[in-house]
Amino acid sequence: MREPGFWHRPPSLVSRLLLPIAAIYGNIAAARMQKAGTTVGVPVLCVGNYHMGGAGKTPTTLALVALLREFGETPVVLSRGYGGRLQGPVQVDPSRHSAADIGDEPLMMARRVPVVVARDRTDGAALACALGATVILMDDGFQNPALTKDASLIVVDSHRSIGNGSVFPAGPLRAPLPLQVARTDALVVVGDGTAADGLAQQITTKGGVVLRARLVPEPASVEALRGRRVLAFAGIGDPARFVATLRDSGVEVVEQRAFADHHPFTAEELAELAAAAKRDGLTLVTTEKDLARIGGAQQALGVEIVPFAVTLAFGDEAKLRLFLLDRLNGARAAKLAGRR
């Protein structure tokens, strides 16, 4: 879905006209969020958003995977598998599954960490535990009440923040903001913008943790594009941020194409991109997530598509480590006490 422009502008007439529907949607979402969830035998850490679209959940999840492994943990990622056809629960196998089966993000992450896809998150958690998980990382699912969460980390872009602050469809929020803030343990602010400063203050006031982070291009990706003129395309939550990251890395972006988040590229669209690149002597570059959706279709194009990989770097990693250790220890103590 491509986000309406008015979501990221001050409240407009269109937004105000949609407020009655937003109130109904918000009440339903709030009631659902407050339902009791199933408690799992291992800590459950949720990485989510307040709003529709992306803000950097997947890089955040992978960064947490790396830290948890340093602690000696065995993390397994649990995903709904947005955009995939399989109901699950199923462990993602990159050699067997496609993005059409299990979604682009699970497929991309499964090359680095065990990933379970399940529409029913309780069933998915059971499979994750059977695979030996000592910690479950929920990729999205903050508003889903199926599992009791031991910590919720919310990712927000520092330039876009939460848009006009209204609930869908008047704005991008998935549920009323006060309820979401109340259930947030840590806010991960990605980038050097100031749009999320007010939100960060709300989290600090309620006793939550604010973590600053930035997306860092992997050196190999930058080197692969050195001296090349590129046509950048992406179907993610914020394609403009992808292009900005490329340019900030010194990549010469000559042309760009933006698609809706999780866009299923057709053969015709890919052929048009390939033709444009050949015509103008450009290199096609996209995100790892987009390349996961394209899959084997690129082989028929006759041109190379270069994935541009990024990782998330935290400004105060020690603060994050303390937060994670505190939550893991607290969760385990509570679960142990509950079994007595």
Curated annotation (Swiss-Prot):
Against InterPro entries, the record matches this protein to: LpxK, P-loop_NTPase
Give residues annotated as binding ATP.
51-58
The answer on whether this UniProt entry bears the keyword Kinase reads yes
The EC number(s) this enzyme carries: 2.7.1.130
Reactions catalysed according to its record: a lipid A disaccharide + ATP = a lipid IVA + ADP + H(+)
Q: Name one GO molecular function term.
A: ATP binding
What protein name does the entry list? Answer: Tetraacyldisaccharide 4'-kinase
- Gene encoding this chain? lpxK
